[in-house]
Each structure stands twice: as structure tokens, then as C-alpha cells.
Amino acid sequence: PPVIFNITDGECTDVPDTILLSVSERIKSLATSAGNVLLFNVHLSTDDSGRGIIFPYSKEKLAADDRTAALLFDMSSDLPESFVPAEGDRRAKAMSYNSSMSELVKMINIGSVSVNNIL
């Protein structure tokens, strides 16, 4: 399916969250014969410690008081099951938070390799 990466280093301040959610839903509803658009949201950090959160399957994996992380989670596509590790029925989100540049490269490679090789 078509893939769109939204890469940011901070919080959106020019429109309300409701508009961001609405636009992301419209984008995710677009489709080709290969399936619906996959919308990835990537929040970059200057910290290259490898502590980024990649492909979370629940908001509990994010900081409880981080509105930006929760918003990106809600805006992101569910990864197709073929991309998700075979460890249950959890649906990973197409997002990362506080990611380094090296983690971004791993995410971009998702269509080429199994998620098991990334995580």
C-alpha cells in the first residue's frame, strides 16, 4: 500500500488537535488496489541513546502525560498484521517517539524487512 511518513521534531502549534486527527483520518482512508494509505508519524529527538519508542501497540507504552505522543499515536495507522511480530494479537502503530536518526532509518526499512529484525 502507499506509505506516507510525517517526520517532526516537536509539537504542532498552528492547528488544533481535532483538525490534525480529522486530516490524518482522511489520509488513512485513501486507497489504491494495494490497500489503504499507511500513515507513519515519526517524532525525532536529538538524543541518540536508542531510547525511542518504535511501533507501540498501546498508549501505555508512551509517557502518560505526553499529549504530543498520544496525538501521534491516534493519528498513526495500525500496521498490517504481516508487519507485526507474531507474539499475540497486538496491533502495533505506525509511529515512533523520541527516535534517533538511526531508528528513523530502521522504520523506513519496514517494507523491506520483518519488524522482528527491527525490534
What is each stretch, according to the model?
Residues P1-L119:
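Acidic, low-complexity intrinsically disordered regions
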